[in-house]
């Protein structure tokens, strides 16, 4: 087993999706094939410190009572950015011992300082292959403003939005008329539906903007879209083929339950129902799958992405793209691929082998 590929599974991070990242990493570690891969779990603390984690991370779960976090008590380390040193992990103690090398990184990080191109840029400098899109696609996919601008430039269907930059307090009357009600107020660069508010009355707008700005100084206000919420997974294979999964539909509970698919609904509360595959007409489903691949290519993604849609009476509309979707046991991305015929373990192996085949640098 000495020829196994050493895979650094990097998780945690400085974003408000730290806990979800920890749980995703636990699922990935549980499904790594031990005959092919040697796992090197590396946690990033909420303060940004890198530590060598232990195998207990594979048992991490998520609940109202316990949101997991990376403990700073592990061996502090860094990944050298010198590409001539072959992915060396160096201890941050007085001795500066080399703790070994890694062949590839699986950066199962969600949100800023991990999914947004920052870590990807560091890995490019280090010359270490990594799972997922590169710097440009990661940065653009993290920022809802530029995601929609790039997709719209390629002629893909997107919803109406207004960007509130730092220093812009609220919407103008003209913008309110253009958007209509309801609107969704979101941090521009956050995921897992954190900081999102549905606004049905303009009197609540400023409070919603303030809530979003707790997570990001740049805020997006999106026009509400009436339609079915559908997701599609996109996967790149080592030979360069790009495929779309079967679709998943999220069905929100009727009555007094949550009004949209928020953080608690996604990860903590068992209140939504899911259809995998989604019960859509074949022609609509195929249209969504084709749009998902086009969105993947429009942002120059590699490896994987999850593309979220609203299927309206006038056709599908792209809501957003996730360049490192959740990998928890209940996450839609692995569930969609399992329904397509690729189980979790094979999915993880495919992503790693695609990263190794792609390498780093201009391509």
From Swiss-Prot:
Reaction equations catalysed: 2 D-alanine + ATP = D-alanyl-D-alanine + ADP + phosphate + H(+)
UniProt entry keywords in alphabetical sequence: ATP-binding, Cell shape, Cell wall biogenesis/degradation, Cytoplasm, Ligase, Magnesium, Manganese, Metal-binding, Nucleotide-binding, Peptidoglycan synthesis
A Pfam family annotated for this UniProt entry: Dala_Dala_lig_N
Bound cofactor: record note: Binds 2 magnesium or manganese ions per subunit.
Matching SUPFAM superfamilies: Glutathione synthetase ATP-binding domain-like, PreATP-grasp domain
Pathway terms, separated by semicolons: Cell wall biogenesis; peptidoglycan biosynthesis
Matching NCBIfam families: D_ala_D_alaTIGR, PRK01372.1, PRK01966.1-4
Annotated family: Belongs to the D-alanine--D-alanine ligase family.
Protein name (record): D-alanine--D-alanine ligase
């Amino acid at each position: 087993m000495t020829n196994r590929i050493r895979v650094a599974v990097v998780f945690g991070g400085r974003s408000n999706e730290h806990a979800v990242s920890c749980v995703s990493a636990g699922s990935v570690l549980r499904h790594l094939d031990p005959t092919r891969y040697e796992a090197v779990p590396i946690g990033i603390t909420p303060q940004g410190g890198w530590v060598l984690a232990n195998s207990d991370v594979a048992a991490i779960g998520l609940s109202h009572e316990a949101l997991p976090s990376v403990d700073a008590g592990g061996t502090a380390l860094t990944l050298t950015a010198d590409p001539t040193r072959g992915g060396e992990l160096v201890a941050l103690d007085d001795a500066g011992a080399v703790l070994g090398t890694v062949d590839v990184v699986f950066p199962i990080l969600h949100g800023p300082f991990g999914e947004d191109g920052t870590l990807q840029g560091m890995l490019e400098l280090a010359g270490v292959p990594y799972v997922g899109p590169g710097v440009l696609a990661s940065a653009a996919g993290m920022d809802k403003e530029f995601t929609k601008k790039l997709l719209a430039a390629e002629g893909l269907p997107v919803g109406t939005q207004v960007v509130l930059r730092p220093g812009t307090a609220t919407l103008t009357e003209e913008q309110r008329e253009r958007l209509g009600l309801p609107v969704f107020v979101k941090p521009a660069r956050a995921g897992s539906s954190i900081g999102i508010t549905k606004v049905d009355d303009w009197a609540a707008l400023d409070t919603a903007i303030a809530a979003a700005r707790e997570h990001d100084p740049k805020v997006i206000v999106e026009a509400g879209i009436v339609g079915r919420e559908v997701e599609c997974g996109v996967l790149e294979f080592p030979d360069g083929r790009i495929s779309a999964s079967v679709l998943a539909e999220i069905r929100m509970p009727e009555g007094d339950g949550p009004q949209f698919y928020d953080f608690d609904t996604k990860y903590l509360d068992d209140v939504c129902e899911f259809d995998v595959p989604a019960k859509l007409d074949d022609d609509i489903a195929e249209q969504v799958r084709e749009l998902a691949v086009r969105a993947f290519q429009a942002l120059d993604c590699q490896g994987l992405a999850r593309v979220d849609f609203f299927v309206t009476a006038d056709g599908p509309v792209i809501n957003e793209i996730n360049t490192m979707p959740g990998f928890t046991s209940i996450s839609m991305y692995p569930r969609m691929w399992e329904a397509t015929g690729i189980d979790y373990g094979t999915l993880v192996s495919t992503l790693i082998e695609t990263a190794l085949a792609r390498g780093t640098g201009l391509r």
